[in-house]
């Protein structure tokens, strides 16, 4: 099993070898904020490997702190309960400057916490990583409240205040509601999107940055302020905007223990340069760090590459480095509802011509991917605040937990590993159907909620607007004669698509019926193996992307 990582939230001041306090950081005028959180979470034991002793785990945290201080980078340390009650960690963390470092809670549930809450321990070890034992989804709502009360009371008795930030791979809505309503937490975080890794599936959510969750579903962004929990949930681990989606079960993130990603100097420089310099709508965010279970030897090289880059970017005014609570408080001051955001890549790693944009709003998310001169809309998921998560009132009894939204196009799950499918932009070229071929897209922002991609094709272009509730594609100056979108899937792929009804496509997923409706353009059946085809009207298609 892969050990999970600590958060690093990244902002428009991600790098500076200066002693300026975090709150004094500035971003360059006109730049959207780029926020980095460095988040390390701490476990007290590692029962799966006898060589990873308590001393090894403790020294890992000592080294993390030393490296962060070397580059004058603050951050957040999240304590699992067994580490919270270990006096060595208490004494160590109490020495950290409060204006640069934050102490919060890591919401995995070890034996001492469960038993102090008066609940029988069912685990094999004192820390058991299985979903039904070590996480809130394995306990009833009443048990969750007892567990929360014990943790928060003991945290306050040790540090003198309640934690402001609580994070975990997965947290249910009941627990988050209770933590906010009673203890007023200001920030949370959950795992990146993934399928099945370590028993956790989170798929189709707000892809990066942060969102206000529905009171009924901690993974689902709310559409209305009166239905949302006013605690921003940040997405963890710094996912590669191109490879992490295509390889949904693997790990291509800022985590420094992975030699192809966060432990690779070339990848680190590419990712952080892209993050800091490419266009973003609203703001951009990333998380870095690693849990101590991986040990210092495994993470040392990656962190020693990452930290000076973050410090340099902060000094240049391109990123902000903040604690998780600082980012949460900024988010709440800035946004009354979940904002629209993008993460764009205008230049991939060497030997790849891929470009991409992830767009998120409180109504949907989408991903556009350019490869070999062609365009594919790999992903569209709708959000609906009335759809509860599976664990709002129920528990999981297996070592798996599942959090989904509502898929209209799911290129990863409906394609093949490493080769996502989705809506392909096609044309009739006289000799048959072929992908439209074009140049490099240019990403800009039209306003606070609308991102734009301009894709040159022939003597014309396709102009793509991603708005809060709609996606518009317009052909300017006849870039391609007879063009259309085909929703392609791999042979044998199972999808929730049911049928075309009028000018909409009907879907049913997890007992919820929803649809893709057309404001402009027409839907028709396709004879080439795709689910259906979208044809333009007057050179334009407009997809309505709000679940009604």
Each language-model region and where it sits:
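Acidic, contiguous internal or C-terminal segments within carbohydrate-active enzymes
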Residues: 449-496
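Acidic-aromatic substrate-binding/catalytic surfaces of carbohydrate-active enzymes
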Residues: 368-450, 458
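Active-site beta->alpha N-cap acidic-glycine motif
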Residues: 26-99, 285-287, 358
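Metal-dependent polysaccharide deacetylase catalytic core of the NodB/CE4 family, i.e.
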Residues: 81-170, 225-252, 281-294
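Catalytic grooves of carbohydrate-active enzymes
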Residues: 43-46, 59, 63-66, 153, ...
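Beta-strand-rich recognition/accessory modules
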Residues: 259-266, 286-289, 485-488, 508-548
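Acidic-and-aromatic substrate-binding clefts and catalytic sites of carbohydrate-active enzymes
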Residues: 50-58, 78-90, 111-114, 167-176, ...
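Catalytic domains of cell-wall/extracellular-matrix polysaccharide-remodeling enzymes
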Residues: 140-215, 469, 473
């Amino acid at each position: 099993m892969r050990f999970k990582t600590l958060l690093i939230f990244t902002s428009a001041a991600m790098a500076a070898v200066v002693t300026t306090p975090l709150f004094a950081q500035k971003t360059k005028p006109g730049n959207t904020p780029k926020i980095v959180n460095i988040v390390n979470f701490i476990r007290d034991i590692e029962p799966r490997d006898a060589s990873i002793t308590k001393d090894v785990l403790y020294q890992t945290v000592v080294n993390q702190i030393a490296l962060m201080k070397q580059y004058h980078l603050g951050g957040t340390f999240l304590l699992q309960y067994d580490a919270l009650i270990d006096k060595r960690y208490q004494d160590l963390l109490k020495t950290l400057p409060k204006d640069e470092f934050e102490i919060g809670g890591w919401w995995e549930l070890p034996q001492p916490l469960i038993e102090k809450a008066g609940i029988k321990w069912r685990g094999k070890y004192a820390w058991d990583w299985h979903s039904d034992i070590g996480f809130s989804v394995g306990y009833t709502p009443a048990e969750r409240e007892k567990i929360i009360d014990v943790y928060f009371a003991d945290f306050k008795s040790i540090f003198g205040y309640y934690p402001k930030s609580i994070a975990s791979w997965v947290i249910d809505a009941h627990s988050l509601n209770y933590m906010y309503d009673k203890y007023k937490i200001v920030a949370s975080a959950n795992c990146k999107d993934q399928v099945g890794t370590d028993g956790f599936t989170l798929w189709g959510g707000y892809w990066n940055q942060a969102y206000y969750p529905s009171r009924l579903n901690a993974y689902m962004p709310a559409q209305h302020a009166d239905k949302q929990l006013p605690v921003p949930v940040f997405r963890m681990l710094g996912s590669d905007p191109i490879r992490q989606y295509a390889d949904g079960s693997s790990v291509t993130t800022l985590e420094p223990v992975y030699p192809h990603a966060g432990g690779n100097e070339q990848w680190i420089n590419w990712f952080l340069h892209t993050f800091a310099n490419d266009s973003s709508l609203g703001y951009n965010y990333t998380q870095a760090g690693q849990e101590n279970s991986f040990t210092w030897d495994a993470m040392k090289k990656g962190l020693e590459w990452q930290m000076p880059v973050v410090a340099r970017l902060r000094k240049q005014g391109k990123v902000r480095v903040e604690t998780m609570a600082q980012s949460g408080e900024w988010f709440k001051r800035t946004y009354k509802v979940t904002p629209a955001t993008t993460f764009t890549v205008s230049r991939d790693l060497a030997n790849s011509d891929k470009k991409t944009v992830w767009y998120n709003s409180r109504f949907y998310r989408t991903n556009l991917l350019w490869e070999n001169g062609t365009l594919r809309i790999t992903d569209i998921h709708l959000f609906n605040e009335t759809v509860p998560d599976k664990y709002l009132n129920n528990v999981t009894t297996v070592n798996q937990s599942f959090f989904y939204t509502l898929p209209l196009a799911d290129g990863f799950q409906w394609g093949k590993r490493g080769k996502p499918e989705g809506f392909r932009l096609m044309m009739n070229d006289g000799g048959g159907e072929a992908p439209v071929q074009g140049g490099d897209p240019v990403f800009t922002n039209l306003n606070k909620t609308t991102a734009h991609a301009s894709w040159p094709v022939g003597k014309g272009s396709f102009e793509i607007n991603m708005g809060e509730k709609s996606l518009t594609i317009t052909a300017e100056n006849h870039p391609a004669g007879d063009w259309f979108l085909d929703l392609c899937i791999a042979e044998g792929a199972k999808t929730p698509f049911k049928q075309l009804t009028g000018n909409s496509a009907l879907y049913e997923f997890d007992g919820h019926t929803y649809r893709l409706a057309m404001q402009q353009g027409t839907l028709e059946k396709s004879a080439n193996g795709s689910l259906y085809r979208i044809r333009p009207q007057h050179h334009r298609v407009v997809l309505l992307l709000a679940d009604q």
